[in-house]
């Protein structure tokens, strides 16, 4: 089991050569027999996976669904509010109790309900995932959602004196190399 605290990232190299980079406030667990009969890991939070090709499928299990691949690079965000999968290279299959959908390079799906939507978004793979590049990419993102990411990234607490501000939306790219930069 590997866990990260707020404002912490960790890189994990699995026994099959797969690299996992855990974002802040995330947890990765896997069996001690990983790579013998299965290549399955459990994720709560967010992580970027660069999966080494192999004969045994690589599976990421989250509270919201499962992602299966043979070898590729992709990001998963599995937090309380839903499940997001974006593919940088290769192809993945995303499934939950009700649906199965395939994604390929440059595609992202954001699942907020029990059904996988066929609403697939095209993403710029050179900017995704934004947290690995020390940026916040916002596309009609609520101020509340952005502030949650800022809190996780910098281990701070942001309070809204006016609750109406939470629903304001932001579109743009914010450099997140340091907190002063973000707050400007």
Model-derived features: where do they sit?
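A residue-level detector for the "anchor" residue at the start of short, highly conserved motifs
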Residues: 1-184
């Amino acid at each position: 089991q590997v866990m990260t605290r707020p404002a912490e990232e960790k890189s994990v190299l699995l026994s099959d050569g797969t690299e996992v980079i855990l974002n802040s406030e995330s947890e990765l667990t896997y069996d001690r027999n990983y790579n013998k009969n299965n290549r399955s890991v459990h994720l709560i939070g967010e992580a970027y996976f660069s999966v080494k090709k192999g004969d045994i499928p690589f599976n990421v299990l989250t509270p919201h669904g499962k992602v299966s691949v043979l070898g590729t690079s992709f990001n998963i965000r599995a937090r309380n509010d839903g499940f997001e999968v974006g593919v940088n290279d290769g192809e993945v299959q995303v499934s939950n109790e009700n649906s199965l959908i395939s994604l390929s390079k440059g595609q992202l799906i954001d699942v907020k309900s029990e059904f996988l939507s066929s609403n697939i978004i095209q993403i710029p793979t050179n900017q995704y995932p934004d947290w690995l590049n020390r940026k916040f990419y916002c596309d009609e993102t609520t101020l509340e959602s952005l502030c949650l990411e800022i809190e996780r990234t910098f281990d701070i607490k942001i309070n809204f004196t006016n609750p109406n501000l939470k629903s304001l939306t932001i579109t743009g790219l914010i450099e997140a190399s340091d907190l002063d930069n973000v707050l400007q």
